[in-house]
Amino acid sequence: MSLDPRIKLVVTGDDFGYCPHRDKGIVDCFHAKVVTNVSLIINGSSAASAASLARRYNIPIGLHANLSEGFPVCAELKQNSSLINCQGFFHGKMGIRKMLSQGLLNMSEVRKELCAQIKLFLELTGMNPQHMDSHQHVHVLPGIREVFAQVLEEHRIHYTRIPVELGLYRCTWIPDTLMEFYKGIEKDALNTVEIFRKHGIRWPDLYIGLSTMGKNMSAYNIQEAIRYGVCSWQSTISTLPDINNSVSIELMTHPGYPSSPEEGGCGEGPDDFSQSLDRLHELEVLKSAPLRNFFLANGVQLCAFTDL
């Protein structure tokens, strides 16, 4: 069964700049035309060389703002700030959420760090980010989302990511603890929508990526996520006038070649996911014939944010 609406699919390779092996895998996917867009983690160990690769191959690139892993970019925040722990690192994926819930994060410092990351992005790439999302979805957290929206508007960055995946709760392969974390992300993201709209920020109609990370990525899972998302979207907009028959989707991906324990990361060394075969698995799925054939059969147009 083919899909009725015209589909524009942005396939984003996250964590570009995390390590050379990751970067090589993402660039290989771009050359294979299965990744259309990358998100640069600016405090990553290979951020400068990754930016050079993007310039060399004309890869559409945005900023993967990072407030949860490694060192801050802003010099004045590296010694004494609410964003770092006693080792000088960001508080981590769960740590930043705990600090936020306790009211211990200084939002003026969040603003300084986001602005410093945009400034460094401009220095490395020679351009403004074409879009801006975040590492571990911190940009939709309460308090941070308001600052994030203001910073994007001030820097004229028009696109971001809203990590709400329709049909996520149907995915029985996701462990309960991880599903609870995803539910929290989606709740925060839904509460972010009006804030981002107020600041003129846009995002694709649909998002896919939570149900298809790492070993959970398969051509079938991506196809089903697209089908379910598009059908749900069609039923939502069917009563609205003057809606054209097209839908935009972002597929968040993390392809690459596994890193070694000695390389990569954002100052603390690479995480387990970076060193696992899950990265290679995603790369192989994205380049697989079944997925390519699905896109071809359904007229899916792979594109970048600049094409939306």
Swiss-Prot record:
The keyword Zinc-finger does not apply. Keywords: Carbohydrate metabolism, Hydrolase, Magnesium, Metal-binding. It holds the Pfam family YdjC. InterPro entries: Glyco_hydro/deAcase_b/a-brl, YdjC-like. It is an enzyme of class 3 (hydrolase). Transmembrane segments: none annotated. Mg(2+) binds at D15, H135. Its EC number is 3.5.1.-. Its cofactor is Mg(2+). GO terms for biological process: carbohydrate metabolic process. Gene3D superfamilies: Glycoside hydrolase/deacetylase. GO terms for molecular function: deacetylase activity; hydrolase activity; magnesium ion binding. The active site is at D14. Probably catalyzes the deacetylation of acetylated carbohydrates an important step in the degradation of oligosaccharides. Belongs to the YdjC deacetylase family. This is Carbohydrate deacetylase. It comes from Xenopus laevis. The lineage of its organism: Eukaryota, Metazoa, Chordata, Craniata, Vertebrata.
